[in-house]
Each structure stands twice: as structure tokens, then as C-alpha cells.
Amino acid sequence: MSNFGASDLEAVLEVADVPPVINQIQFSPFEFRRTLLQACERRGVALEAYSPLGTGRHLRDRQVARIAERLGRTPAQVLIRWSLQRDVVVLPKSTHRERIEQNAHVFDFALTHEDMAALDGLDRTGGTDHALERPWW
């Protein structure tokens, strides 16, 4: 599935002979859709973060940069690691070999509870998935 909100997910699960295994949405600390993440966790549906780097705009955030500098990591690595620590599948996009290699080096460090909380605070959705709801269906 792609861009299904929590209510859409429930509607599909009510009628599906074969339940979905993954839901791909835009997901990052800036689009931290807690309600949908929790719904997917409860129902055994993996969440896949599309555009976890926000087409680059999130890489310039001051909070992300401070954490990255303290850890000796890139802002992209910090954002990818945040999703991984939430058990979210991450699909960062890059066409540059160096960045692709950097993006893969995120399994040898962890963000602290304080780092995770600071990044959670960047959310602009209020934790909801209203932007994903489809009232016209």
C-alpha cells in the first residue's frame, strides 16, 4: 500500500483476503505520523518511510545538524537512524555514490533517548495522518 492513513488501513484489513504487509508513506521527524505508526504496529503492517530526508530540506535543520555534529555523523544519517530506531523501513533517495555509501553506514551507532525526543519535537503533523485521509473514496 502507499499513502494509506490509519482509517484506510483498517478498512482494507476488514475486507482483504490477503492483508497488506507494508504501507509506504512520507515519514520523518518532520512528518512523524504517530497514530499511523501505532496502527501499523498493532496490525503487523510494516511502515516504509518514503523521502525520509525531505528532498534535502530537513538536512539543513539546526536541531538535526547539532545532533549530527555531536555524533560525528551526517544529518542524513541521523534522520535515517531515527526511522530505523522506530522499526520503520527507510528508502532514502540519492544519485550520488558518496551519499548512498554514507546513508548505508547507520548501523554502528544509536541515537540517545534525548536525541529521539528532540527529533520527535520537529513533527509538523501533530502526530496525525490527516493529510493521508481520502474523503473522496
What role is predicted for each listed range?
Residues 1-137:
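Beta/alpha (TIM)-barrel catalytic core signal, keyed to glycine-rich beta->alpha loops juxtaposed to Asp/Glu
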